[in-house]
């Protein structure tokens, strides 16, 4: 880590109260592949992205969620548990948890990802959260993960079990728009962009021909979901 990176790592620990023995693990968890590639191409040696930690974190998350389900819902059918596990470990839920702890603020992103709104993209936040789980697991063990996140995930799991939270921003946006305008929102692919060699889809969501939000993603579906989320949150603020 250089000095500016260390300051961000230290600020993350101060703001969240999650203190690492090995700060390099935390740095790696916060390091998106676009940033690692950019730094390595600039001549730095062995700047590693969070992809391997994300791989481990996916398994840690699955165990964590399954343990909560096994203990709290002993009478539930296996099929129901599998459905809830999938929802509780979904990109949408992980992005919610990430936003609550302001994880996006501390991510190291390449210039392209920064420019295209990667800091608040569900997929990037969810991947970074999984990487963070792995880093905590390696640094402080599984019990620390339970201490930090068990209560929050129990809350989401309970809502999912009750059918109150299988959240779909596109459906939620459509309900608001149709109640006010009597027509569904329209999703329009306006262009594609290049970012570190990857194609980024840019989608506008429109109501009565007027653009209300723009989303970006590595697939058209992801860009539509992002546009729907931004539009939904914007409309909620306007209603408040």
Curated annotation (Swiss-Prot):
PANTHER family: RIBONUCLEASE 3, RIBONUCLEASE III. GO terms for cellular component: cytoplasm. One of its GO terms (biological process) is mRNA processing. This is Ribonuclease 3. The active site is at 58, 130. It comes from the Bacteria. It is an enzyme of class 3 (hydrolase). Residues 168-237 form the DRBM domain. Its main location: cytoplasm. Keywords: Cytoplasm, Endonuclease, Hydrolase, Magnesium, Metal-binding, mRNA processing, Nuclease, RNA-binding, rRNA processing, rRNA-binding, tRNA processing. Gene3D superfamilies: 3.30.160.20, Ribonuclease III domain. The gene is rnc. HAMAP family: RNase_III.
């Amino acid at each position: 880590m250089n000095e500016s990176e260390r300051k961000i790592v230290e600020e993350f620990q101060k703001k969240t109260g999650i203190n690492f023995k090995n700060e390099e693990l935390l740095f790696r968890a916060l390091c998106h592949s676009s940033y690692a590639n950019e730094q390595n191409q600039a001549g730095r040696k062995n700047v590693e992205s969070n992809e391997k930690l994300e791989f481990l974190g996916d398994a840690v998350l699955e165990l964590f969620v399954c343990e909560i389900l096994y203990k709290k819902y002993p009478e539930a059918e296996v099929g129901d548990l599998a459905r809830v596990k999938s929802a509780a470990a979904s990109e949408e839920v992980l992005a919610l948890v990430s936003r609550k702890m302001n994880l996006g603020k501390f991510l190291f992103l390449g210039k392209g990802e920064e420019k295209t709104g990667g800091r608040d993209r569900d997929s990037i936040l969810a991947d970074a959260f999984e990487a963070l789980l792995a880093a905590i697991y390696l640094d402080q063990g599984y019990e620390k993960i339970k201490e930090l996140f068990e209560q929050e995930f129990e809350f989401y799991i309970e809502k999912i079990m009750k059918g109150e939270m299988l959240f779909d921003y596109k459906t939620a946006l459509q309900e608001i728009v149709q109640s006010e305008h009597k027509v569904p929102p329209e999703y329009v692919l306006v262009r594609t962009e290049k970012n570190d060699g990857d194609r980024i889809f840019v989608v506008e969501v429109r109501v009565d021909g007027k653009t209300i939000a723009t989303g970006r993603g590595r697939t058209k579906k992801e860009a539509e979901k992002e546009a729907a989320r931004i539009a939904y949150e914007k409309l909620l603020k306007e209603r408040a």
